[in-house]
Amino acid sequence: MGAQFHMDPDTYLEEIRADIPRYDELQERTIDAIPFAPGRILELGVGTGETTRRLLERYPDAEVIGLDSQPGMVFRAREMGIEVRLARMEDPLPDGPWDLVLSVLSVHHLQADGKQDLFRRVREQSRALVLGDVVVADVRVAELEKGVDFPDRAVDVAAWCDGGVVWEADDLAVIRATYE
């Protein structure tokens, strides 16, 4: 299991952009990797709602439900009108089926066995999975927090979710899996 991760919703975007200079590119590449126009989307680690906002710009008819383990982030996302539930990725997923399960910068907080368990549960309930996250790479850009961040190699994460790496730069990757 990953450790509990805490960020201030008021300063999150500023801090994440300072820590991850390619944050906005990662967001765009993740959304570009969605293989079809999804109807029902489950977002893991919704945070302040930035990814959901971008998703709904691209897919305005989609229904997005978000999960986050931080009450402050849940509150902030709800202020944006997003349906968000307070839950950890280790908890049972809300009832599917989901057209798409999507996560940006959240899954790396799980250790390898937690990632594999999550991907098994996602496969059972969704048509596709798209992840944009920090991975182990030769070049380290993002600062990692010991006991909180557990990145793995992109090829390993892709294998665990039966997917493939569709974009990789520095220590970031977008991974897509389809289960149709």
Q: Where are the model-predicted features located?
A:
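Conserved alpha-helix/loop element of class I SAM-dependent methyltransferases that forms part
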Residues: P21-A37
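Class I SAM-dependent methyltransferase SAM/SAH-binding core
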Residues: L44, T48-D91
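A conserved beta-strand element that flanks and buttresses the S-adenosyl-L-methionine
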Residues: L102
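C-terminal alpha-helical "lid/dimerization" subdomain adjacent to the S-adenosyl-L-methionine
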Residues: L131-I175
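A short, conserved alpha-helix within the catalytic core of class I
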Residues: L110-R121
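Hydrophobic adenine-recognition pocket in adenosine-nucleotide-binding enzymes
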Residues: S106
